[in-house]
Design a protein with these regions (language model features):
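A short glycine-rich, Lys/Arg-flanked "PGG" loop and its adjoining helix->strand segment in the class I
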Residues: 139-154
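Core SAM-dependent methyltransferase catalytic element
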Residues: 192-193, 201-225
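Short alpha-helix
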Residues: 54, 58, 175-201
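A short SAM/SAH-binding and catalytic strip from SAM-dependent methyltransferases
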Residues: 124-139
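Conserved class I S-adenosyl-L-methionine
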Residues: 154-185
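A short acidic, Gly/Pro-enriched loop at the edge of an enzyme's catalytic core
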Residues: 113-126
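Class I SAM-dependent methyltransferase SAM/SAH-binding core
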Residues: 50, 54-57, 61-116
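Class I SAM-dependent methyltransferase Rossmann-like catalytic core
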Residues: 16-63
Length: 225
């Protein structure tokens, strides 16, 4: 897997959401409650088999394992080998119940409350697959992910070019795939909880492209070191 710095410059130190994203960036065509939109279970995959395999390859190459939080989870998590303990947080209880890889399931709407219902340093790694484009307060969510990660824990965000357009934020819909990488890079940088942001891109030949952007919570090292 080719690893590179995430495309585009990171926002300058001290930047705020208003400095980086224009007014209306996080608006959506359908502003109604996500719980209503996702009330009916969708036991289908949202990317093709090649892109699914690419997600699994990213997890394997990065060694995502241990106690892992699968953010905005559903009925499948795309891990070739299930982590030791996988916790799924999503919107639909039926979808989460159908996911055999999950050890624990939490129904929680991040667009209503971006706070994660977990203690500090609860997970070794975290993932978010093809869902980051629906977050209306993503920097708050990324900050929370950093809080619940242990030092050196990675947050791996994967996405393609498919979405539910009425629920995706306006800024995402108006941007191409390279722009999406830059958007996620900005989320990491603005959260203030992660180190260097890395990216992997698979162009896809006639199928769904797959992009991965990730960063780790810094490890401060031993006390007094």
């Amino acid at each position: 897997m080719t690893r590179r710095r995430a495309g585009g410059p990171s926002p300058p130190y001290g930047s705020t959401m208003a400095d980086v994203f224009p007014p209306g960036f996080f608006d959506r065509a359908d502003p109604t409650a996500d719980t209503a939109f996702y009330d009916v279970p969708r036991l289908v995959t949202h990317i093709d088999d090649a892109a699914i395999a690419a997600v699994g390859a990213v997890y394997t190459e990065l060694g995502v394992d241990g106690e892992v939080l699968d953010l905005m989870s559903s009925w499948v998590s795309h891990f070739p080998v299930t982590p030791r303990r996988l916790v799924g947080l999503g919107l639909n209880a039926t979808e989460l119940a159908a996911n055999p890889a999950l050890a624990d399931r939490v129904v929680h709407d991040l667009n209503v409350d971006p706070r994660l219902p977990f203690p500090d340093a609860a997970f070794d790694d975290a993932t978010c697959c093809v869902s980051v484009d629906y977050l209306t307060d993503p920097v708050a969510v990324f900050r929370e992910v950093a809080r619940v990660l242990r030092p050196s824990g990675r947050f791996v965000v994967t996405f393609s070019n498919r979405c539910f357009p009425t629920k995706a934020i306006r800024g995402w819909l108006s941007t191409d795939d390279d722009g999406h990488v830059q958007i996620v890079n900005a989320y990491f940088a603005l959260s203030g909880g992660f180190g260097e942001v890395r990216a992997h891109r698979r162009a896809g030949r006639g199928g769904d492209p797959l992009y991965a952007v990730w960063a780790a919570r810094p490890d401060p090292g031993p006390p007094g070191g």
